[in-house]
C-alpha cells in the first residue's frame, strides 16, 4: 500500500516563476499524515505540536516569497513520516522519539518500510528542488538557497534566549551578509541548532555542493504563531535577503 496517493504531490511550488535569485525552501511546512499511516498513533493535539511541523514557518515562507518575488517549495507531509532535512541514514530521519514524545508509528520499521518512505517522500521532494536548481544553473541564473524553519522557546525545560538563528556549516557568506538581524530581537549564528545536530543536510546537498550561497533560518515559533507575526517576520527577513539578492543579480 502506498503512503502517498499516486495523484498527490509531496511538494508544492509557490510562485515557481519568481524572478528573485533567492530560492526558498520550507521542508517542515505541514503536519499532514496520510490516512494509510493512521496518524502514526498520535493524537490530534500531538500532531498540532512542534514535533509534527515547524509552526508558522510556512506562513512566513509564503509571505516572503511574495515580498521577494521568489520561488518557494514546501513539503506537504509531516516531518514525522520522513524529515526531508535529514539524510536517509540519519537516526532522526524517521524518529521513534521526538523531543519527549514517543512516535508509535515509527517503532520497529522494517528496511522495506523505511525505503518506502525514502522513495515516496524524501526522493520526490529533493528531486523537485534539484530539478529547479538544475534549470536555473543551465540558464546561468544567479541563485541562493534559503530554508525557513521555526523552533520552540522551551526545549527540554530550558528557555531559549535566541529569537532568530542564522545557520550555516562550511560556507558563512550569506549569514555574514544578512547582518545583525532585526532590532530588538536576539539574533545568533548556529543557534538553537547547528551543523553538529545534523540539520544542514538540505543546505549541504543543494547549496554547498553546488557552490551556491545558502542559509538556514530559524525563527522562534512564539513570534510567528499568528498571521500578523508571520507577515511581520517575513518583512524582517525580506530587507536583508533583498539586498543579498540584488548583489547576486549584479554579479551575473
Residues covered by each model-derived region:
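N-terminal catalytic or cofactor-binding beta/alpha core of small enzyme domains
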Residues: 1-145, 150-252
